[in-house]
Curated annotation (Swiss-Prot):
PROSITE patterns: RIBOSOMAL_S19
Keyword annotations from UniProtKB, A to Z: Cytoplasm, Ribonucleoprotein, Ribosomal protein
Annotated GO biological process: translation
Record family assignment: Belongs to the universal ribosomal protein uS19 family.
Entry keyword Ribonucleoprotein: yes
Protein's cellular compartments: Cytoplasm
Protein name: Small ribosomal subunit protein uS19w
InterPro entries with a match to the protein in the record: Ribosomal_uS19, Ribosomal_uS19_CS, Ribosomal_uS19_euk/arc, Ribosomal_uS19_SF
Entry GO MF terms: RNA binding; structural constituent of ribosome
Length: 149
């Protein structure tokens, strides 16, 4: 900061980047109908919505609404568990906490605005990443000569 500003005692307010999804701000996204919202999604997700929402995703959204209504003001809503890894995140879900099943456990995922248009599965990894060990017996000649620890 400039010394004149510090000497005057004026503190400049920090400005944060306002979230927007494909040029539309968050408040407008929350007010949009699903038909208008789908126009901003990628083609894969537009196709998914055009084929219709079945009963299961709608049941999850109803449970999320109920959890938000029952939560006290200023508190996070209760977690809602689901196996629906193929559910697409819509603006209505923002702020909710969802337990996404990965085949073994439910991973807690707090929905943030940046997640709109992604699948729930992208935030709950279903496999354990490989930690490679030492080269084995059948390894090639060049990889056998890695110095031992």
């Amino acid at each position: 900061m400039e010394p004149e500003v510090v000497a005057a005692g004026i503190v400049k307010k920090r400005t944060f980047k306002k979230f927007s999804f494909r040029g539309v701000d968050l408040d407008a996204l929350l007010d949009m109908s699903i038909e208008d919202l789908v126009k901003h999604f990628s083609s894969r997700i537009r196709r998914r919505f055009s084929r219709g929402l079945t009963r299961k995703p709608m049941a999850l959204i109803k449970k999320l609404r109920k959890a938000k209504m029952e939560a006290p003001a200023g508190e996070k809503p209760a977690s809602v568990r689901t196996h629906l890894r193929n559910m697409i995140i819509v603006p209505e879900m923002i702020g909710s906490i969802i337990g996404v099943y990965n085949g073994k456990t439910f991973n807690q995922v707090e929905i943030k605005p940046e997640m709109i248009g992604h699948y729930l599965a992208e935030f709950s990894i279903s496999y354990k990443p490989v930690k490679h060990g030492r080269p084995g017996v059948g390894a090639t000649n060049s990889s056998r000569f890695i110095p031992l620890k």
